[in-house]
Curated annotation (Swiss-Prot):
Protein name: Transposon Ty1-GR2 Gag polyprotein
Subcellular location: Cytoplasm
Lineage: Eukaryota, Fungi, Dikarya, Ascomycota, Saccharomycotina
Chain intervals for the UniProt region annotation (RNA-binding): 299-401
UniProt source species: Saccharomyces cerevisiae (strain ATCC 204508 / S288c) (Baker's yeast)
MF terms in GO: RNA binding
Amino acid sequence: MESQQLSQHSHISHGSACASVTSKEVHTNQDPLDVSASKIQEYDKASTKANSQQTTTPASSAVPENPHHASPQPASVPPPQNGPYPQQCMMTQNQANPSGWSFYGHPSMIPYTPYQMSPMYFPPGPQSQFPQYPSSVGTPLSTPSPESGNTFTDSSSADSDMTSTKKYVRPPPMLTSPNDFPNWVKTYIKFLQNSNLGGIIPTVNGKPVRQITDDELTFLYNTFQIFAPSQFLPTWVKDILSVDYTDIMKILSKSIEKMQSDTQEANDIVTLANLQYNGSTPADAFETKVTNIIDRLNNNGIHINNKVACQLIMRGLSGEYKFLRYTRHRHLNMTVAELFLDIHAIYEEQQGSRNSKPNYRRNPSDEKNDSRSYTNTTKPKVIARNPQKTNNSKSKTARAHNVSTSNNSPSTDNDSISKSTTEPIQLNNKHDLHLRPGTY
């Protein structure tokens, strides 16, 4: 009797143990021995069906085959459905689309862990693991930025953001047109500077301040891919990416060169429109300056023809060069070289006239010596006139004496005197002057 109860009890316990292994409906807090007899048959059927689908090993002669015994082989695990990564490591839909990622439009385009050096990836609170951007993310490029100023900050100011872990950095807007790329890349460079990456941005000479790391290059590539879709990139950017799709540094370097070129073009146009020349500088230097500006503008695609160039040059002429505006203003076929020939001619004439003039100041003593020497040269003329006056004075005295004594003298003497007054007086001097008495 006891043997029958033990065998029955062992049979029940063995079936319940199998049920606890094969069935998923058994709760962990339930006693595996507390099973009703009506469920034992269901457990046996389930275990039999599972054993029929698996390959069983041949039973040993020492151990009898038990139809209720489950196979010890491990259950097969299905292969991952999304590439080489295991399924339990894949990001769930809720994790991939937290609040704030909807502004990107395509969150699945970020297959990497965000760059951890940037303060934008250190939002307050331990629960935030993804970048949290304000509601302005994804706005058009024409939307004004809340950040003050449009100029770029230097790398030193950008490095100061390393200590601030609560500062949020506004990302660049989405690029929506190839024509907007020059303006978009300025905001992207501003974004990199605010993200503590100002040192990797190429400088004026085309070289960054420091070497970029692999993590920074990954961050650069992914952010560029997110905010600048390939269909909106200019042709020259696509050409660079076709050679190396990760060479974002070359794109930034070329963009900075184009910015500098645009600034130089504007400066050249302003300089050419405000030319001034009056001969104070050599004509060769003035010609070199003007021709270099015109050649640089022509090479950059801004064509300046001879007519426009001559008008701009002549408008800035002053002084002795001003008359060229009136002598040449109707000459439609005049070239810049012909205009500079006239400018050189006037400049050489000015230099020749300046060299012919004395370049020293006369002393007052020299002027006195010159006046004395001039008086000495005229002195013989003064001396020559003195004897004439003395002779004339003597003749007047003689005539007065003759007139006073004419009453006592005979008439013949009076006739001779009257006759002598009508005849010219001969003066013996070296100038041989003939004077009439009536003139004095």
